[in-house]
Structure formats: C-alpha cells, structure tokens
C-alpha cells in the first residue's frame, strides 16, 4: 500500500519544523492525516485565455477541502503566443513548456503533494502541465479555462465569424481600409478564453479530454458559460476520490500513466487527425509520451494519418465553424462517437471519471445519450457580450447540431475528406519527417512544385513577402528556426498570414524547421527534421532549387542530385565552428535560451531535452 507522499512532512517529531510552517499556512492538527492536493493554476493578466482564472483555483480548493483533502494552490507562468508572435518574444514560447513542466515538478516534489488539479488553457501551459503530470505520475485531473467566443462583425451586409488570424490578415492586407481593419481588430477576440478556433490551445484541451485526463465537455465548453463552473467543482471532488483510491486502496488505475496509456495516446492522435488540430499537438504528444515512458513516435502518427478521415472542420480551416459550434455538435465526445462507430478507436481505455470509452459514449455522445442534462450542457452557447469574466452568461442554442451529414461534425460516410487533417511527409531533406495540416490545404495545391526562396530567419521572410519579393509559384524556406537553431522553434503565423494578405495563400508553399501556430492554414509544412542546426539537409537548400511536395503520397523532395547534396554538405562542414549556423543572421539570445538550445532535440522527438547529454 503506497503511503501518502505528504506524510513525510506532516508526521514524526523530527518534522516539527515542517508542521510549524504548514500551520502558518492555515493547517490544523486535523489536516495532518489528509492528502495534500496541489491546485496548479496559471492565472495571468497577460493572456486572455488565463485572465479569468484568478478565482477558479479557490473554487476547486473549496471542493477539495469539503471532500476531505487539503488544497494548496500555486501558479505557473503562461506565455501568450499571439502577443509574443512576430518578434523576439516568440523565442521564449516553446522553451516555456519545459519551464512549466519543471516548475510543477519542483513545487510538487519539494512540498511532497499527493495529487494535482491542473488549471490550464493556452498553448504551452496545457502541454507543460501534461508533461509534468506524466513525469510525476500522481493522481491528476485537468480542467482548463475554456474557449473564447468567436468574434462576429458585419462586413458587406453579412455577419461573419472572426478570430485572431482574421485580424492579422486584414491588418497586413494593403487592399483593406483602415476602418475595416480596425473593425475586425476590435471584433476578433471578444471574451476571455483560448482563441476561438481549433488552434493549439483548444486542440490540446481536446486531446487532454481524449487522453482521459479531463472530464467530458472540457475541450469545448465556452469559458464564459455558467455550465463550465461545474467542471471545476467536479474536479475538486473527484481528485480526492482518485487520491484516496490510489493511496488507501492501492488502485493504480487512478494514476495518469494508467489512464493516458499508449492506447489512449493513439485515440488522442486519432481525434487530432479527425478534427484537423494544430500541428503543434504532434510536438506536444510526442513530448508527453516520452514523459510517460510510452513508445509513441512519428511512425505511429504516420500510420494513423493514413487511415483516419477528417470528420470535423473548424477555423482556421473554415470560417464557418469555431469551438462554440463544435460544442453544439457534441464536442470531443461527439467526434469520438463517430470515430468509434467507424471502428477507429481503442475501446479498452478509461478516464478520470472511471468510465470506459463505451460507457463515456453511452452517457455523453449526443447521438445516443438519453440524458437530458447532457444534451442541455451541449446546448451551451455564446452570449456575444464582451467580457473577461468566467461563467458570466447562460445562453443556449435552441437546438443541438446532430446533423452528421452536413453539420460541423460528420460521420464516416459524410467525412469532409477520406484523408485526415494532419499528415507526415518524408523526403531527402526531411529524413525524420515533417508535418502539414492538410485540413487547411486547398485541394488544388495538394501537389506543388516550385523554386525555393531561402531565408535564415522569420524576419527576413516577412520582409520579403511584404516587399513583393515572393511571387506565385515560390516555395518559401525558413530555416535555422528549429528548437536548437532559433532557438525556441518560433511559430510562423505571420509569414503564412502575410502570404494570404498578399494574395498568395493558394499560390505558394512555406517550409520550415520551425513550427506553425494553430491558427495557420495553407500549404505550410513545418517541423522539418533533422533541423538545420542539427545538420539537417534543409540547411543545404539554395535559392532556385526545385522542391516537389506530394501530400497524397506523403512525399517531399529537393530535386537536387545526391552528388550535389554531398558536395554542399562537405562545404558546410568545412566551415568548422560556423557549420550549420546561419551565414547572414545577427541574433542575440539570452543565456536562458542558449541553455535550452544546448539540450534541445529536433521536432520529431517532441523538441524535448536530450537526456543522453545528461547521462539519462
């Protein structure tokens, strides 16, 4: 029978000092036999997805204490990728994931907490907390802040839905008037919550639900809706039950590594492909799997991508649907229900509620459930009122979207595409693979060949795009922006958005060893591995080289002879200490980022730290 981890700080005369300090936090004699549960919050006023979380830790804590636990809250950092985008701040985004994971480990292990409730929401916070949870392997429940309502405005006598990406594209489009750009900017992000499309934050919160580590509805229920409060209340109660099951009944099924098993990872990736999630999710699932000591690789993702259809299409892949529409159609469980009926899921998995997948679908899939309360929860909709307050409205859709022929979520028979929303490509400069969000690629450019325009920084590429130096038919290559080369593997949302602003969204491709925002769409291929800074062949591409992209056949090829590539590699190696570094880039980075770069692996490994360099 495992002992409560916290007992080492609360029992025994030699722990009098620790107990004295616990008493100073408000604990009493009656608390010293109870489980101590960390409430891992991520409130910050910098990030709209986290601005409403200040009081939500208290909600969870009250339920923990009412159920017989002791709650202790702390905060992690949270970087807003949208605000950090397009300048040096983006260098810090991905490294913040490791910092979050480490800080959770530090706090939880330093104070010997027995379990956790993780209150996350945005891009690197959910992955960082997920990595920490699987590393620590103590009972955990995730409950996120929830999605933002979609922006809405009237343009050309028509009400359209908007998000952050629309504001970026219109702001850079010289054909758009100042007044229209201002109108879109003011309408794009109307409430608290994670950006309203299937960008990285919402994708990861959906995947956490599919992994079984959060409750049904967590991935799609709006941040502003009153129904979301119940998820926080339930999390506080349930974590005490899970904790006691493990420590008092020796039930290891309560542990995250047993819930988020390899079968669950496969289900989560299947969901990701079916819903056309952010390409960043590949990076984060690979990283989380390593923390869980699960053998889940790019090869597994490639195999799944070849058999899973696209059953859901959401912004940025379409302007018609946002997360509020996914929720109305049944949310994550709605998509999982269709995948299950198609025979594409592992059914022998459980979630934090203790329900198997069939039990979860029976209770929460709007197509089959008889539970009116569940149907009512999925009718929770937007209010259209600007606010930074959680749970501030209780509007509901008149009806559910259960149309699996033409609705937001489709059945296998009516899939948006027989090919899924993500694909892994391989070729002579992506030997370990690269990722494309096929959900956002127009059918006309699934096969594309063009001359390379090579840039060794995102900034140079942006300048060239906006300066008219990139023309229809070009393949923009941005390299030395990988985990090590950036460092930090910047997102390329500005270059892809500016291609659209210049009318080149369907006329050019963009390839990088960096990554893309979940808001990116178009022929945007990222995570090229190995990256240039690790000696990857993307570092050998020259201006004018033809690059052939073949998404249907999962190929990407630099049309240069092996002999020529060998000669270029020899010339690169001859640069000595300067080999595999940018020739024409001046970028000063901090010691913290250099430390990150010294241990960073390429994207095919999840951009995690190289344990072999530390003897592990």
Swiss-Prot record:
[2Fe-2S] cluster binds at residues 122, 195. It comes from the Bacteria. Its EC number is 4.2.1.9. GO terms for cellular component: cytosol. It catalyses: (2R)-2,3-dihydroxy-3-methylbutanoate = 3-methyl-2-oxobutanoate + H2O; (2R,3R)-2,3-dihydroxy-3-methylpentanoate = (S)-3-methyl-2-oxopentanoate + H2O. GO terms for molecular function: 2 iron, 2 sulfur cluster binding; dihydroxy-acid dehydratase activity; magnesium ion binding. Pathway: Amino-acid biosynthesis; L-isoleucine biosynthesis; L-isoleucine from 2-oxobutanoate: step 3/4; Amino-acid biosynthesis; L-valine biosynthesis; L-valine from pyruvate: step 3/4. GO terms for biological process: isoleucine biosynthetic process; L-valine biosynthetic process. Mg(2+) binds at residues 81, 123-124, 491. It is an enzyme of class 4 (lyase). The active site is at 517 (proton acceptor). The modification N6-carboxylysine is found at residue 124. Binds 1 [2Fe-2S] cluster per subunit. This cluster acts as a Lewis acid cofactor. SUPFAM superfamilies: IlvD/EDD N-terminal domain-like, LeuD/IlvD-like. Keywords: 2Fe-2S, Amino-acid biosynthesis, Branched-chain amino acid biosynthesis, Iron, Iron-sulfur, Lyase, Magnesium, Metal-binding. Coiled coil: none annotated. InterPro entries: Dihydro-acid_dehy_C, DihydroxyA_deHydtase, DiOHA_6PGluconate_deHydtase_CS, ILV_EDD_C, ILV_EDD_N, IlvD/EDD_N. Its cofactor is [2Fe-2S] cluster; Mg(2+). Belongs to the IlvD/Edd family. PANTHER family: D-XYLONATE DEHYDRATASE, D-XYLONATE DEHYDRATASE YAGF-RELATED. Homodimer. Functions in the biosynthesis of branched-chain amino acids. Catalyzes the dehydration of (2R,3R)-2,3-dihydroxy-3-methylpentanoate (2,3-dihydroxy-3-methylvalerate) into 2-oxo-3-methylpentanoate (2-oxo-3-methylvalerate) and of (2R)-2,3-dihydroxy-3-methylbutanoate (2,3-dihydroxyisovalerate) into 2-oxo-3-methylbutanoate (2-oxoisovalerate), the penultimate precursor to L-isoleucine and L-valine, respectively. This is Dihydroxy-acid dehydratase. It comes from Escherichia coli O45:K1 (strain S88 / ExPEC). The lineage of its organism: Bacteria, Pseudomonadati, Pseudomonadota, Gammaproteobacteria, Enterobacterales.
